[in-house]
From Swiss-Prot:
Transmembrane found in the keyword field: yes
Lineage top rank: taxon: Eukaryota
Major site of localization recorded for this protein: membrane
Localization terms from the record: Membrane
InterPro entries cross-referenced by the UniProt entry: TMEM254
Regions crossing the membrane: 15-35, 63-83, 95-115
Gene: Tmem254
Protein name: Transmembrane protein 254
Classification of source organism: Eukaryota, Metazoa, Chordata, Craniata, Vertebrata
This protein's UniProt keywords: Membrane, Transmembrane, Transmembrane helix
Membrane topology: Multi-pass membrane protein
Coiled coil: none
GO cellular component: membrane
Length: 123
């Protein structure tokens, strides 16, 4: 989606970072919920490290997983606050910011932080 300005401003984030985040979070989900199906021996150095974490810290991994999603919810809600502060009042743009930030966290939120709306002169 292209970027608009003012009340309907939205900018999609970097495809590179979104891919890195999606692959990482997918792997994390796999580790937490289906660790018995992971081919540890085929993952190079990541395999034994992941196996060690699963064997010794699975509860911590699971709690960290849910904490990560909770943080993403908080970031998404903060994105809505930032939208209002920056004059982004279009409900579709706000929804896009909320969803993008929920899925990709600070990779999305940093774009919204950097946005500087043009202020109109008041005479």
């Amino acid at each position: 989606m292209g970027t608009a300005t003012g009340a309907s401003y939205f900018q999609r984030g970097s495809l590179f970072w979104f891919t890195v985040i999606a692959v990482s979070f997918s792997y994390y989900t796999w580790v937490v919920f289906w660790p018995q199906s992971i081919p540890y021996q085929s993952l190079g150095p990541l395999g034994p490290f992941t196996k060690y974490l699963v064997d010794h810290y699975h509860t911590l991994l699971r709690n960290g997983y849910w904490l990560a999603w909770l943080v993403h919810v908080g970031e998404s809600l903060y994105a809505l606050v930032l939208c209002r502060r920056k004059g982004i009042t279009d409900s579709q743009a706000q929804l896009l910011w909320f969803l993008q930030t929920f899925l990709f966290g600070v990779a999305s939120l940093s774009i919204l932080f950097a946005y500087r709306p043009k202020h109109q002169k008041h005479n």
